[in-house]
From Swiss-Prot:
Molecular function, one GO term: 3'-tRNA processing endoribonuclease activity
SUPFAM superfamilies for the chain: Metallo-hydrolase/oxidoreductase
Coiled coil (UniProt feature): none
Taxonomy, superkingdom: Bacteria
UniProt: Zn(2+) 2 binding residues: 67-68, 212, 270
Protein family: Belongs to the RNase Z family.
Gene3D superfamilies linked to this entry: Ribonuclease Z/Hydroxyacylglutathione hydrolase-like (3.60.15.10)
Protein name: Ribonuclease Z
Sites where the protein binds Zn(2+) 1: 63, 65, 141, 212
Record's subunit section: Homodimer.
Keywords, sorted A to Z: Endonuclease, Hydrolase, Metal-binding, Nuclease, tRNA processing, Zinc
Xref: CDD domains: RNaseZ_ZiPD-like_MBL-fold
Cofactor entry: Zn(2+)
Length: 307
């Protein structure tokens, strides 16, 4: 599991930062990539990374402001042009379906893969399978905006191979049957129960990715005990009133959410273009005063998520 930040700016592109898009690489977990927001020129940013459009399985849109969605039509079309054939699902607030369908229709863009568009109308679980569960809550922004909590389900423990070898059990099909939890009778009549030969499960990771938001309780709830919290930090602490007026957060407010939620790690993104050069480091300094394990994302930077 790895984050690749494709765009970390706020509002409009700048020389140093493109607008919002985050790839969550789940190559080991499911051989796919999930994308969170898709601002203008996201597909161009992808060219500089290891992200492959054909592997994008899901796109989660936080809200419908242009700096979070204007890259969608181009990416969807290019994915088809580049040979993508597997199903892609887009999740987002009401209106995302109309935006995509009109853009594809007017531009006569035809996608050759199954495209599903899921409009989120209420809080709760928007996706769940045997590996992951994605929950969403409304945040506090000028238009409807969602945050996403991605929960990796606990992973079955490893087969205790040394224990089996110590009992004289030779590697082979019996190992797989035991790992699958079956009760197996060996040729010598010994009966082995699979559950006795499986180590403790590995706890799944929790990732929280928030859209644009004021400081709010929903952010804390989504981030509770997260391994990684990705939070916007559009403004410095001295501009807290301006952040409130424009429905955004300061770096210190993001750190406060991480602290209250008992998150393990905080990554700041959605940085205003007013913070050019090294001035953005002041945002990092302010956040670390409250929450030491804070990092600030820059375009094309990757962050692995360890177990």
């Amino acid at each position: 599991m790895e984050f690749v930040f494709l765009g970390t700016g706020a509002g409009v592109p700048s020389k140093g930062r493109n607008v919002s898009a985050i790839a969550l690489q789940l190559l080991e977990e499911r051989g796919q990539t999930w994308l969170f927001d898709c601002g203008e020129a996201t597909q161009h940013q992808i060219l500089h990374t290891s992200v492959r459009p054909r592997r994008i399985e899901k796109i989660f849109i936080t809200h419908l402001h242009g700096d979070h969605i204007f890259g969608l039509p181009g990416l969807l079309g290019s994915r088809s042009f580049q040979g993508g054939t597997t199903k892609l699902t887009v999740y987002g607030p009401k209106g995302i379906k109309q935006f995509i369908e009109v853009a594809l229709l007017v531009s006569t863009t035809h996608v050759k893969y199954p495209l599903e568009i899921v409009e989120i109308t209420e809080e709760g679980i928007v996706f769940e399978d045997n590996e992951f569960c994605v929950e969403t809550k409304r945040l506090s922004h000028g238009i409807e905006c969602f945050g996403y909590r991605i929960v990796e389900k606990d992973i079955q423990g490893a087969l205790l191979v040394d224990k089996l070898l110590g009992m004289g059990v030779k590697p082979g099909p019996v190992f797989k049957r035991l790992k699958d939890g079956e009760v197996v009778e060996l040729e010598n009549g010994t009966v082995l129960d699979g559950k006795d030969f499986i180590g403790p499960p590995q706890k799944g990771r929790v990732i929280t990715i928030l859209g644009d938001t004021r400081y709010c309780e929903a952010s804390r709830e989504l981030a509770q005990d997260a391994d990684v919290l990705v939070h916007e930090a559009t403004f410095a602490a001295e501009d807290e009133q301006q952040a409130y007026d424009y429905f955004h957060s300061t770096s210190k407010q993001a750190a406060s959410i991480a602290l209250q939620a008992n998150a393990k790690r905080l990554i700041l993104t959605h940085i205003s273009s007013r913070y050019q050069g090294d001035t953005y480091k002041e945002l990092l300094k302010e956040a670390r005063e409250l929450f030491s394990n804070t990092e600030i994302a820059t375009d094309l930077k990757s962050f692995p998520v360890e177990r």
